[in-house]
Amino acid sequence: MPGMPNPTQELKGKIPPHNLEAERAVLGAVLLDDSALSTATEQLSASSFYSAAHQRIFQALVELSDLGQRPDILVLSEHLRSCEALDFVGGSAYVASLTDAVPSAANVEYYTRIVCDAAMRRSLLKVARIITAEAFNDTVSGNIVLETAQREIYDLTNARRVATFKLLKNLIPDLVNTIETRYRNQSDLVGIATGLTALDNLTGGFQNSELIVIGARPSMGKTALAMTMASNIAIRQRIPTAFFSLEMSNLLLMQRLIAAESGVSATNLRKGLLQLSDFGRIQNAAGEMYDAPLYIVDVPNMKLLDLRAVARRLCVQEKIQIIFVDYLGLIVADNPFAPRYEQFAAISQSLKSLARELDIPIVALSQVGRPAEGSAPNLADIRGSGAIEQDADVVMFLHRDRNETETQLILAKQRNGPIGTVELEFQASFTRFVCKSP
């Protein structure tokens, strides 16, 4: 439309945000006082600098620090010369001039914030160009463009610095400290405890970046098991937890949760058949639950890209540490017209990627086919079994005779631990699972 401004055209020819004097001040501060490097590296990486010469100088300062050397002007110049980079950065004279840019290292944090802010603005412009290019591409759907935008912004929000390699000797102290802490605590748990002790003993708790799949036939109690775990994690341990309920409304989930926490029959709650004493138990349970960091998302037929977007937002805003998804078969794949097995594969791969991206465990429920009467389910029975078996770090199955309370939780796959069977008791009246008494 004539007269309408074109933001893309307006940006052409503009120099990206930067502040060379602040960059020189950061580098000069480090040369004056090597302890300033710790302050700078908390927010900056080499790519945070606009000048290519400054990028290489900062990287050299980090390299010298890693080697245990104090990076003064002479040492830095010799290091750059040995790397054949001294001429590239402007020679020894330019390196020496960096200390002229700042009287002392006292204000390095201030200069670092300026450089960091300019780097963030350049990154935002880069993301904007990526999104704009995809938005103009008619072969890419709007939903995919939205997913790209959400992913890029999330990555930008959380990418404080670029990934770096570490020498083995630099990793050993952290490992030794972790081992010593575990020894002092005398605990087998290295992940998030589910509250089902026998299961936690087998798994060591649910680990960050893991995809855990719980499979069962219909009406075996998948949701009840997931809610048992989620309530143990969020209510008793106060660990921020997200529960994506694609099958059941949040009101029904809360009704189940109140029954499980109060010990009041779920059937009586649903029908209103309550005794006066029940109200006190319900109020006590509600009080325990009130401040629990349990976030319920009840969107039927939720799209995969929406699930990822909400999960990212919850992790940023609420610091979620574990996600439950009930259940895989109700997630709408990005390509709903693909064959169903391809959709399952895409969903499985996406959830595993999301677990790694967010660095938290994701627990996904799944229905299994009907095995022969009386036989326990196995990996081949789970829908999308090929993809799930490949992507999941842990796969477990609920198994029991339909009208029995004694339940087996079969740990059929554990990438980093043993397999086995956990004996549980299903308390149907309260829609909860507990470990079977020995």
UniProtKB/Swiss-Prot annotation:
One cellular component (GO) term of this entry: cytosol
Hydrolase listed as a keyword: yes
Top-level EC class: isomerase
Record-level Gene Ontology MF annotations: ATP binding; ATP hydrolysis activity; DNA binding; DNA helicase activity
GO BP terms in the entry: DNA replication, synthesis of primer
InterPro entries: DNA_heli_DnaB-like_N_sf, DNA_helicase_DnaB, DNA_helicase_DnaB-like_C, DNA_helicase_DnaB-like_N, DNA_helicase_N/primase_C, P-loop_NTPase
Parts of the chain that traverse the membrane: none
EC number: 5.6.2.3
Subunit and partners: Homohexamer.
Family that this chain belongs to: Belongs to the helicase family. DnaB subfamily.
Protein name: Replicative DNA helicase DnaB
